[in-house]
């Protein structure tokens, strides 16, 4: 079956989880010989069309403004209207009001899949403005895919349409850390157990609780936080306030070429997120692929604690409680038997559920089933 698909949604260049998923879908499908293009609003001045391979194009439209994490790109509307009829399936990635508006105005008559990455949690005012458009999108969708069974069953806007809801776990390529880079990182913290976290420095990540947990850890632990964002200054001030300059390190943006090395260098990966905005957390899957035990949070309605199976790939704790973070980290790190159990459990869970191949296989099955209906 010759399938033609368009991934529609979040902006380029790739920084966050949704963009990573769109790009992984585009590459994974195209490398299987399926025609798959990606249309998105550009977050910089790089616009136009780029040929990724024989079966995939990246199409970036000009952004005029950014409002409540939404790219305002009128050009996306005209571009989509011009190309939409070339595709059997449009796979739109939610939440993205701009992409939803473009689809609404496109006149597209083919199959639509909505990938429900997250509810709109923080931007309550935005939600009220776009709710009629979102209700249309839910009605228009032939299939709604979530990233975990927990999230889509709990999403308020999907309660009445569960018959057309399914889930597909996000998979990632197995990380292969460069041994020399791993050694270089570990040599910067000699004799220390390394707790690593990576993500945007924003409120829902709960990094302030991870920093507070450092005060409860012995001196042979260090906490490394990779990523950039608006709360960087506030978090650095916390580190100074609590005199943790030798124990907590805000690393800033981690280049892609050294991402794997930090996973390989750490002893434990910690996800301290506190809000349902954190629906899945691809970073913990990436850490699992390196055999790293996970400490994550039990956020009601989120898939985070489903990804990290408690007692198998690591431990899940109450959000916003630094004492529980410190306790879980030590439970994993202080007993070699426990550490090995969770390390092997993380690797096993990755290979069973979260490989790039498994995700691509699942996606193709959904596409074929939809087109056969």
Language-model segments: residues:
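Conserved acidic donor-binding segment of nucleotide-sugar-dependent glycosyltransferases
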Residues: 309-322, 331-337
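Short alpha-helical donor nucleotide-sugar binding micro-motif in glycosyltransferases
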Residues: 138, 253-254, 261-266
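Donor nucleotide-sugar binding/catalytic pocket of nucleotide-sugar-dependent glycosyltransferases
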Residues: 40, 134-180
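Conserved donor-binding/catalytic core segment of Leloir-type glycosyltransferases
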Residues: 6, 184-215, 224
